[in-house]
Amino acid sequence: MKRENQSSVSEFLLLDLPIWPEQQAVFFTLFLGMYLITVLGNLLIILLIRLDSHLHTPMFFFLSHLALTDISLSSVTVPKMLLSMQTQDQSILYAGCVTQMYFFIFFTDLDNFLLTSMAYDRYVAICHPLRYTTIMKEGLCNLLVTVSWILSCTNALSHTLLLAQLSFCADNTIPHFFCDLVALLKLSCSDISLNELVIFTVGQAVITLPLICILISYGHIGVTILKAPSTKGIFKALSTCGSHLSVVSLYYGTIIGLYFLPSSSASSDKDVIASVMYTVITPLLNPFIYSLRNRDIKGALERLFNRATVLSQ
C-alpha cells in the first residue's frame, strides 16, 4: 500500500544513539576513544603480521584480512556518528546513505566469510596436521579471501540495486545511527516484497551458512581433541582455537540476539544497541582477544619492542 505525501527524498535524518542531550559529550569521548583504539589495535595486528616472519602462516594471513575488515566496518559508521554528535547535524545525503548501507553490508558479510575461512584453517591444522602445509597452500588462502570478497560484494550490490529502485515518502527519519537496510525499507512507499524476499533468503544464507560451517568445523575439532592421546595435545589445540572461538562467539552471539530472539516493545533501541556491539565493540575487542590469548602474537609484539629499543639506542 502506498503512503500519502510521497515525494523525492534527497536526504535522510539519522536519530543517532538513544541517549540524553546532556550525555552527548560523554558518549562522544567514549566512542572516539574506542574508535581510535580499534583502528590502532587492528593496525598493530596487521603490522606485526607483515613484519614478523614467524607470523607468515595461513591463520595469521586470514587474521590480517579480518583486522582490516574490522577497521573498515567501524569506519563506515562511527565517524559519521561522531560528526553528528559534535555538530548536531543528523542529515545524510541520499547517495551517502546508500553508499554507507552498501559498505556496511559488504564488510559485515566479509567478516562472516573470513571467520569461516579461519575455522576451516583450524580444522585442517588440528584434524589433519600432517597434511596441513599441503592443503593450506598460498593459492588456496588467496582463493578463499578472493571468494569472500566477491560473495560479499555481490550480496551488498544486490541489496543496493534493489533499494535504488524504491521510492521514499516524506518521512525521511531513520531511527538508527547509520543507514540500516531494514530501517530504510520501512520508509519506502514502494512494494518491498522483492527486497524482503532477498533479505530472508540470500541475506539469511550469508549469516547461517557460514555459522553452520564454523559449527561443523569445531564439531570435528572437538572430536579430535577428545581423542587426543595426551593432555598436552588437548591444551595445545584449545590454545590454538581459543582466540578464534572467542571472536566467533562474540560476533554471532550479537547477531543471534538481534535477528533470532523475540522482539520487545523497545525493538528499535535493541537494534541500535546490538548494532553498536558488532560495529564498535567487537572490532575493538578483537585485537585484545588475539594478543592476550595468542602466544605467537605476544611473541611478535615483544620482538617488535626489542627491535625498536635496539634501534633507539
From Swiss-Prot:
Residues 1-25, 80-100, 159-195, 260-272 are extracellular. Its main location: membrane. GO terms for molecular function: G protein-coupled receptor activity; olfactory receptor activity. Keywords: Cell membrane, Disulfide bond, G-protein coupled receptor, Glycoprotein, Membrane, Olfaction, Receptor, Sensory transduction, Transducer, Transmembrane, Transmembrane helix. Disulfide bonds join C97-C189. One of its GO terms (cellular component) is plasma membrane. Glycans are attached at N5. It comes from the Eukaryota. It is a multi-pass membrane protein. It is found in: Cell membrane. Residues 50-57, 121-139, 220-236, 293-313 are cytoplasmic. The chain crosses the membrane at residues 26-49, 58-79, 101-120, 140-158, 196-219, 237-259, 273-292. The keyword Signal does not apply. GO terms for biological process: signal transduction. InterPro entries: GPCR_Rhodpsn, GPCR_Rhodpsn_7TM, Olfact_rcpt. Odorant receptor. Belongs to the G-protein coupled receptor 1 family. This is Olfactory receptor 1J4. It comes from Homo sapiens (Human). The gene is OR1J4.
